[in-house]
């Protein structure tokens, strides 16, 4: 055993609202009495589909856990579920889970789909759709919601890897505790029932009209909903306050299939590697794994692949495995933590619940799950795994408090190097082309020609796709996936990394998006058709992680794999997670990308909400303080290649800069306000310079991604108060404001320009005081600063390469 008690991640509180119960006791009773929560649908009208059943959360009194004002503000059911479950977890823990020293890691698949549906329902009925409803529908809404209702101001990671998201969230909570970044983390997931989601899976013909029977018959899944949250603390803090320790998170892994946008690798390779890596990370032996909680969606392709993976993972040993989806249905982004909760409660009651409705092994499934009445057994350790659309896989290893045969890997403070940069924007395809365009004063904002839109934007002009990179198969990709794949491949090439099959597991992928690809075709199919016929091709790309799935497949990247949807300007957060993975030795190389795509319905809604400039300032995009929202949007992708600096030097790589520190914080406040307060940004900056071992006066230049509105004043004020006359550098006023990737692109352009001795390009701020500030001849330290009205603040400190 090699562990530091301070940094062991322990579970001290659980809150759950699920189809089989709304607290731990009720859930355990359902597991014990073999009572599933699958029944006739009551929350949505499914009469036009082949299946009329689902698994719903029932009998929740939101008013007992939420104030009158909160009930008025948060109307989307998934946000209400999240608030109540999180509060239950905090109450169950007894910990003080508030303030700036607490982090959040939250996952969702569909986010506020019920709110998103209103946008399309309003086209065909009198349903109201407003900015307030739209904000609740965004992937990142859950972060601001919990920050404002729970008063949490630490770092916040919003994960969207579809059905594996909350398992990956638990993995990150372990990293944050193990690496000493936080002593308390609130982790969870939430998704609510929605007609658009039900229609999508029905169109794929994977929804069963009978109760799901994983690894057996009938074939098919049942759609579920729900939420679960855990309070995770470091061991010493929990013991010091005499907390009831419910379990330990001792291992984790994420991987990518690199196989198909929706279907799993039929060999079960990705699932096997994920379980294997989680076991290796925990340091326990296969003999210590007493049970596997399988993903077991009930679909033909998933169950066959997972059965192969379990057989390979188990080797010649018998490891009981079960599926709690047979109780709860498939609860989308919350399914991982709901299933882990079910298994943790069962382990603490010395019980392995059975896979319900089992009628014998299905053809093609090589192993038999625990069935019928379950197993009465005292055990100390289990593995829980989930596998999702886009080949996103995640697994965790959970143990009882008394279990000691594990290792908490030591985390070092190694420097992390940026060794490759790739990008695609309205200025061109490639970093060199974009930077050259910046230095020549070119502006990429123009009339929109790809779709109907009366406003201007910085749209990418794609040539025939085969001319972009003849090694890549772009077949089936949407625009955002093309953008990200091009940028990621350029970053690899720029770093001198030529992907080979034998190194695919050494390379990880971190994505950041604010939304998925255009959902118009699917949503219009659902709400402009009485039969609710969704669009199969579009539906598979609506999930935010589909972009990373396409990149993974195109470039054969099979290592650690995650997608963040933390909010506007959050592309720079990928550097924070990259630093955690590399310092934890969970990857050798990492591609970190951010991507955005503009589409017609998005621009129409933004116009309705007053987000678009429509006067003379649209034609000459510069800073204007007359609004907190109005901007000129752009699109594209930027990707960085990262590795440990010692590894980069060993292979004589070209180093653009070293990540000294990367920090995020969260602002709560009024959910609908513009977040003009600078407290969270200032806190992030202070923490970052402390971690980097520098002072504010050491910063030579600031990279930022302004929206071009009053919101940007907090970064200007921070500069003026601590770093007077330091240049502010951005590509935004040349390219248009891309919601997620502009923060990463501005930094990438700056580092590339400095590396090639091109200095700074002339800024288009529109105020001489900012446009013509002189910079040191050779800047040494760059501060990348980002913030937005969605509550997130992101700061990275970069040492410029010599």
Mark where each language-model region is.
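Condensing-enzyme catalytic core mediating Claisen C-C bond formation in acyl metabolism
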Residues: 7-14, 32-42, 50-52, 207, ...
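Short acidic, glycine/serine/threonine-rich loops at helix termini
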Residues: 21-22, 115-119, 170, 195-200, ...
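Structural signature of cysteine-dependent C-C bond-forming condensing enzymes
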Residues: 2-6, 92-107, 119-131, 144-156, ...
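Conserved small-residue
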Residues: 11-13, 31, 86, 104, ...
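Internal metal/ion-chelating core segments
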Residues: 159-232, 238, 565-635, 642
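Acidic, glycine-rich active-site loops and adjacent beta-strand->loop/helix elements
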Residues: 15-17, 108-111, 162-165, 189-194, ...
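Conserved beta-ketoacyl condensing-enzyme motif
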Residues: 10-11, 35-160, 190-198, 286-304, ...
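Active-site pocket-shaping loop/turn-to-helix segments
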Residues: 6, 19-20, 66-87, 130-138, ...
């Amino acid at each position: 055993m090699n562990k530091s008690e301070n940094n062991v991640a322990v579970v001290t509180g659980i809150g759950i609202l699920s189809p089989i119960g709304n607290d731990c006791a009720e859930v355990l009773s359902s597991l014990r009495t073999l009572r599933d929560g699958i029944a006739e649908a009551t929350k949505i009208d499914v009469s036009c589909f082949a299946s009329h059943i689902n698994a719903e959360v029932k009998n929740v009194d939101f008013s007992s856990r939420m104030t009158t004002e909160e009930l008025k503000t948060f109307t989307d059911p998934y946000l209400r579920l999240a608030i109540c479950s999180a509060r239950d977890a905090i109450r169950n823990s007894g910990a003080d889970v508030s303030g700036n020293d607490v982090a959040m890691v939250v996952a969702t698949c569909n986010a506020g789909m019920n709110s998103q549906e209103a946008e399309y329902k309003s086209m065909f009925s009198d349903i109201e759709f407003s900015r307030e409803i739209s904000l609740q529908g965004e992937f990142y809404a859950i972060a601001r919601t919990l920050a404002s209702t729970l008063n949490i101001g630490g770092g916040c990671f919003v994960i969207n890897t579809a059905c594996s998201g909350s398992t990956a969230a638990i993995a990150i909570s372990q990293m944050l505790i193990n690496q000493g970044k936080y002593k308390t983390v609130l982790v969870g997931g939430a998704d609510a029932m929605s007609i658009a989601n039900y229609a999508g899976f029905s169109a794929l013909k994977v929804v069963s009209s009978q109760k799901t029977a994983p690894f057996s018959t009938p074939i098919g899944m049942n759609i579920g909903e729900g939420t679960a949250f855990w309070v995770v603390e470091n061991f010493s803090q929990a013991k010091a306050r005499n907390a009831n320790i419910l379990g330990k998170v001792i291992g984790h892994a994420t991987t990518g299939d690199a196989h198909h946008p929706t279907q799993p690798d039929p060999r079960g390779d990705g699932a096997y590697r994920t379980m294997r890596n989680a076991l290796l990370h925990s340091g326990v032996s296969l003999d210590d794994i007493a049970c596997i909680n399988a993903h077991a969606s009930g679909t033909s392709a998933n169950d066959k692949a997972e059965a192969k993976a379990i057989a390979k993972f188990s080797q010649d040993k018998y490891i009981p495995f079960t599926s709690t989806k047979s109780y709860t249905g498939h609860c989308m982004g919350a399914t991982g933590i709901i299933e882990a909760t079910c298994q943790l409660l069962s382990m603490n009651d010395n019980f392995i619940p059975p896979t319900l409705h089992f009628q014998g092994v299905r053809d093609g499934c090589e192993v038999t799950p625990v069935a019928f009445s379950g197993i009465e057994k005292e055990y100390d350790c289990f593995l829980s795994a989930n596998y999702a659309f886009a080949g996103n896989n995640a697994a965790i290893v959970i143990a009882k408090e008394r279990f000691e045969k594990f290792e908490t890997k030591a985390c070092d403070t190694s420097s992390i190097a940026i060794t490759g940069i790739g990008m695609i924007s309205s200025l061109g395809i490639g970093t060199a082309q974009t930077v050259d365009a910046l230095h020549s004063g070119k502006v990429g904002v123009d009339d929109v020609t790809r779709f109907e839109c009366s406003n201007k934007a910085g749209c990418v002009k794609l040539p025939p796709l085969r001319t972009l990179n003849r090694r890549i198969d772009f077949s089936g990709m949407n625009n955002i996936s093309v953008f990200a794949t091009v940028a990621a491949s350029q970053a690899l090439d720029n770093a001198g990394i030529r992907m080979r099959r034998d190194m695919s597991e050494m390379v990880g992928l971190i994505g950041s998006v604010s939304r998925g690809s255009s959902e118009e075709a699917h949503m219009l199919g659902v709400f402009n058709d009485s039969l609710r016929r969704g669009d199969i091709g579009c539906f598979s790309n609506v999930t935010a992680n589909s972009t990373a799935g396409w990149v993974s497949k195109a470039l054969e990247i099979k290592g650690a794999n995650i997608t963040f949807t933390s909010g506007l300007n959050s592309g720079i957060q990928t550097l924070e997670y990259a630093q955690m993975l590399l310092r934890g030795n969970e990857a050798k190389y990492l591609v970190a990308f951010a991507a955005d795509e503009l589409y017609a319905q998005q621009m129409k809604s933004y116009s309705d909400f007053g987000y678009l400039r429509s006067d003379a300032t649209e034609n000459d995009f510069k800073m204007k303080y007359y609004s907190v929202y109005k901007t000129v949007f752009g699109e594209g992708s930027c990707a960085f290649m990262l590795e440990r600096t010692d590894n980069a030097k060993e292979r004589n790589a070209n180093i653009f800069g070293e990540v000294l520190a990367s920090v995020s914080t969260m602002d709560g406040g009024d959910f609908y306000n513009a977040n003009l307060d600078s407290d969270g940004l200032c806190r992030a900056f202070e923490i970052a310079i402390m971690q980097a071992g520098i002072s504010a006066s050491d910063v030579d230049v600031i990279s930022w991604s302004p929206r071009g509105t009053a919101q940007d004043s907090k970064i200007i004020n921070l500069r003026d108060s601590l770093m007077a006359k330091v240049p502010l550098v951005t590509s935004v006023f040349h390219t248009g404001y891309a919601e997620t990737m502009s923060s990463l692109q501005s930094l990438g352009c700056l580092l590339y320009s400095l590396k090639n001795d091109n200095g700074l390009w002339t800024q288009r701020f529109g105020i001489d005081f900012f446009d013509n500030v002189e910079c040191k001849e050779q800047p040494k330290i760059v501060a990348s600063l980002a913030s937005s009205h969605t509550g997130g603040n992101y700061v990275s400190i970069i040492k410029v390469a010599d």
